[in-house]
Amino acid sequence: MQKTTRTMPAHKHIALVAHDNYKPELLRWVKENKEKLQSHFLYATGTTGHMLSRETGLAIKSMISGPMGGDQQLGALISEGKIDMLIFFWDPLNAVPHDPDVKALLRIASVWNIPVATNRATAKFLFESPLLNEEVDVEIPDYQAYLAGRT
């Protein structure tokens, strides 16, 4: 597939997601990184977003709950170039009814080449990066070229 470049802004659009068993862990991480998060645009699946906003006071645009389609809503935003980073504390030891949605969200994040943290260590590396607050060029699929080749 042909590639093109997209410039991520200095103020990133960051999606925050956590499975039920990892919501307390994500909340702790968000509290630890609240100062950094305040300068970015935050999105989350419904239950997670409402909990984080209530507990931290951060402005978070909440989708609907993950099992009800929130993961897919975030995936759509990623494919539209409206999400720059995904912090997803998923539970690798428990299956959830919407596992196919989870896999689709992680797949679409990979397709559109956005940074993804699935645990605290990776989230720490991303948030310690000097690129967090800078414009960053990333290669993404050239959808227009893809479409032209298929029609």
Curated annotation (Swiss-Prot):
<dbReference type="InterPro" id="IPR011607">
    <property type="entry name" value="MGS-like_dom"/>
</dbReference>
<feature type="binding site">
    <location>
        <begin position="45"/>
        <end position="48"/>
    </location>
    <ligand>
        <name>substrate</name>
    </ligand>
</feature>
<feature type="active site" description="Proton donor/acceptor">
    <location>
        <position position="71"/>
    </location>
</feature>
<dbReference type="GO" id="GO:0005829">
    <property type="term" value="C:cytosol"/>
</dbReference>
<dbReference type="Pfam" id="PF02142">
    <property type="entry name" value="MGS"/>
</dbReference>
<comment type="function">
    <text>Catalyzes the formation of methylglyoxal from dihydroxyacetone phosphate.</text>
</comment>
<dbReference type="GO" id="GO:0019242">
    <property type="term" value="P:methylglyoxal biosynthetic process"/>
</dbReference>
<feature type="binding site">
    <location>
        <position position="23"/>
    </location>
    <ligand>
        <name>substrate</name>
    </ligand>
</feature>
<keyword id="KW-0456">Lyase</keyword>
<dbReference type="GO" id="GO:0008929">
    <property type="term" value="F:methylglyoxal synthase activity"/>
</dbReference>
<feature type="binding site">
    <location>
        <position position="19"/>
    </location>
    <ligand>
        <name>substrate</name>
    </ligand>
</feature>
<comment type="similarity">
    <text>Belongs to the methylglyoxal synthase family.</text>
</comment>
<dbReference type="InterPro" id="IPR018148">
    <property type="entry name" value="Methylglyoxal_synth_AS"/>
</dbReference>
<dbReference type="InterPro" id="IPR004363">
    <property type="entry name" value="Methylgl_synth"/>
</dbReference>
<feature type="domain" description="MGS-like">
    <location>
        <begin position="6"/>
        <end position="151"/>
    </location>
</feature>
<protein>
    <recommendedName>
        <fullName>Methylglyoxal synthase</fullName>
        <ecNumber>4.2.3.3</ecNumber>
    </recommendedName>
</protein>
<dbReference type="InterPro" id="IPR036914">
    <property type="entry name" value="MGS-like_dom_sf"/>
</dbReference>
<feature type="binding site">
    <location>
        <position position="98"/>
    </location>
    <ligand>
        <name>substrate</name>
    </ligand>
</feature>
<feature type="binding site">
    <location>
        <begin position="65"/>
        <end position="66"/>
    </location>
    <ligand>
        <name>substrate</name>
    </ligand>
</feature>
